[in-house]
Amino acid sequence: FGYCISDDPNASPSGPYYDASAYCVLDNDFSPSQFGTSQTPQEFRDVTAAHEFFHAIQFHYDWFEDLWLMEGTAMVMEDQYADDVNDNVNYLGNSALTSPGTPVDRGSGGFEYGAWIFWRFLIEDRNELADPLIIKQIWERAAGASIDTDGLGPDTVVRNEYSLEAARRVVAA
């Protein structure tokens, strides 16, 4: 389908900042012979572009973030952009909904993609369907980079929480 990656020579998991520039690559035709017919090539293109573009946005915050946050929020952006495609429902089998006792922040076994339903719940619970601000707020709290969201200056680190703690604090606010 596609991928998003950084070629930023300064991006490093051991550096003081975890933000990185990014570029995305998408398949050139989403041919049914390659991807099947569960969606049209245009639908595959739409959800893949939304998903990968959101990864590029995530890289601005922290490209080494937990997979459940990265993939789950990218999946929910597919739903935001192309709600009628419903490709993301294919991942509900690997979610806390269908596997009681599995942590919502599990980052393996496909559960990182199935976490989208948790993010969708938060968006709907906040009545933010048109503008899912809660997702941005959680990314800002979890960011490894200094992001000036409080007017304290770009060199003031006020975030850098683990993803689950960032989500908990934003929801509790």
Regions found by a protein language model. Give the residues of each.
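Generic, well-ordered alpha-helical scaffold segments in large soluble proteins
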Residues: 56, 122-125
